[in-house]
Amino acid sequence: MREFEYYLFENFDADKESRNPLNPRNILGKETDALLSEIVNKEASYIECCENHGAQFVQKLVDGGVLRRSRNRLFFDSPIFLREDAAVLHAQISSRASSLADLLESKIPEIRGCCAGITNGFPVELNLYHILCGMVFDGCFFDYLYSKGALATSRQHPSGLDYLSVIYEKCGELRSFSDGLLCSYNRFVNAECSLQSFGDANGNRHDFYRFFRLMEQGRLPEKYRDVEVLLMNSFGGANKDILLDEVVSLIQTGWCAPAAMALLEAFGYAQNGRVCVPVFTPDYQSVIAEIEGIVEKSIGAAVVSTLLDLAGSLDITAVKHGVDKLEIANELYHIVFGSINEELVSRGIVAVPQRISGEGRYFKCIELYT
């Protein structure tokens, strides 16, 4: 049996929907691995899969957008990448990403000039890591690509939840794409504030988002027990709004509740009573927009062309199964911009995140929205 990794791009509140039985995080797992393996390894019929795995479970995956039924056949309905696809992905994407990085590098002096408007006390390279690699490539540039019809950012499911799902086979050949690239956000967020980290997906980061996901799954390591007790006693359990209100208070007034400071220090967002990571306030939105505009002008058309070409022509499983091209393009874009980010790191243009054993490579920051 093959094993798979499941990735979700959620357009819903992950905390509020954590116990929803139709949340794909509560469905996808070992049982799914067995069914997907059957479909990969042979032309499994719908009836046969229902007999082997249960009609109700098969229907959950159809409703969840993982599978699609056509007459008596089951096909993949989400972007899926198998070991057999790895060589094609490496051959087609690496050189294109390097060329795009070349185009962008010519604009770096102009982009660095924009960063003069960021006065948060941190080096330009670290601010650029968060702004260019994260906020632009994994944020507003996404909106640009969507506006050009180059990718999908949303899919409404019968459950009422809006998300995109992506599946990778667990194998060394795909690891550099599935969890090795700098293209992954963790955001503990509400309408006012975000405690976030950006990096690769090669481990469980020591941050608020991962802490809450592990707690929901009942997989919280022993090292977090004191933090869990503090959270339960001081903030009414997993009430993130109360905690994030304290973060806003700290940044705007210099003070927050001692329990909030203890949590921020426990997760490395503060040290000795002070915030120790970059803070991005609404005052910096004009700078971020200016940088995004430079990126758009320098590589926007080239990225659109690259995605539309790759999503429709690559000889990979998802294309063969007729998965929506714009959903395929969404994940291909993650691979492309993650590869560009790796180029920016290796060329010394942005700060270099150090690898932490069991956690991967990432940097943290705080962003205020109001």
Regions found by a protein language model. Give the residues of each.
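Long, charged low-complexity terminal regions
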Residues: 248, 255-268, 275-278, 293-306
